[in-house]
Amino acid sequence: MKKLLVLLLFFSIMPFSLFACGVEPSPEAPTESENRSEEEKSDPTSDLPAINDVSVPERSGSFKAVVLGDSIARGYGLESPESMRYSALMAESLGAFYETVDISNYGVDGRTGVELLEFLKTDPPKEINDCDCVIISIGGNNILQMLDTAQTAFNALMELDPKAVADYFKYAVAPEGEEKDKLAYACDAISSVFGAVNAAFESETFNSLITDAGKRLEEEIPLIVAEIRKLNPNAKIYFQTVYNPYKGMNVSLKEVDEQLKLDDYGERSVACLNAPIEALSEELGYEVVPVWTEFDESGKDLVNAGISLLPFDISVDPHPNWQGHELIAKIYCDIITEVK
């Protein structure tokens, strides 16, 4: 069965979706400075996404950026984060436009908005002082309190019996009779699991936590921006929206009473986080980077989460795969080169 793309943070994010965060520790110092050598820059060919689909002008000047944020920024789950995450891909692509490109990455797994604010107050990256722009990926981990609720839902999903799934498809094509009656249990088994997942995400506790996470982010964004402005009043600030890692992960099966609605829950959750990101941009003078919209509209497999019922396979990891990082890099490069 065709793989369905999926969902909350959420963020940075977590071992599970926007709900959980990566568990690998990351240092509070840049894990890289993405400078391309002159030899590397001399080769114009690249598998990286095309930028703006226009002729590349002669390289000139320099570009310096600082990336702040969570596990998405750090590249959690990639085989080689230092070379495959979107900041590294940006450095590679922007090398066709600038003589020197320097991107310092301070992404940390599980980092929340309040933790980023504390980092900027107590140990700000020195690179911010003279950088051209600051790139922020934050918000998903603000819903860490939802971990118990999300874990309950995902545990229920993981308990879906592969044999019941296989028997369901046998049931769907079996002729009426004794054999079909024996397989009918599969409909109830799948419906029960889907119902348990839905109940967790539809609970009052879950919805309250989503709302609170959005309110906290609304309070934190002005403080984060203010700290960056203290360090560098002239730096351009880019704040990326949170994508829905469970896009396409609604599942409806004939004669199964419950529909699995992870896409719906994911969309509702990220909307609460993206609302303040978008609403405050004009007032605070930062640019919103539409990662949420671009992921929704791409139609590609951009995250690790997904469901395949035949063969049976489920992943709820919300982090971008390499293609996801490629798309994020392209979004930034298009914006940056447009104003060059």
Q: Which role fits each region the language model picked out?
A:
Residues 1-4:
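Positively charged n-region of N-terminal signal peptides that target proteins for export
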Residues 8-17:
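Bacterial N-terminal signal peptides
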Residues 18-29:
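Bacterial lipoprotein signal-peptidase II cleavage site
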Residues 39-109, 124-128:
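Serine-esterase "nucleophile elbow" of acetyl-processing enzymes
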Residues 64-69, 73, 102-107, 132-137, ...:
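Structural recognition of the beta-strand scaffold that forms the well-ordered cores
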Residues 115-212, 244-245:
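Oxyanion-hole/transition-state-stabilizing segment in secreted/luminal serine hydrolases
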Residues 188-208, 222-267:
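Active-site segments of SGNH/GDSL-like serine hydrolases
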Residues 242-340:
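Catalytic His-Asp segment of secreted/periplasmic serine-dependent ester chemistry enzymes
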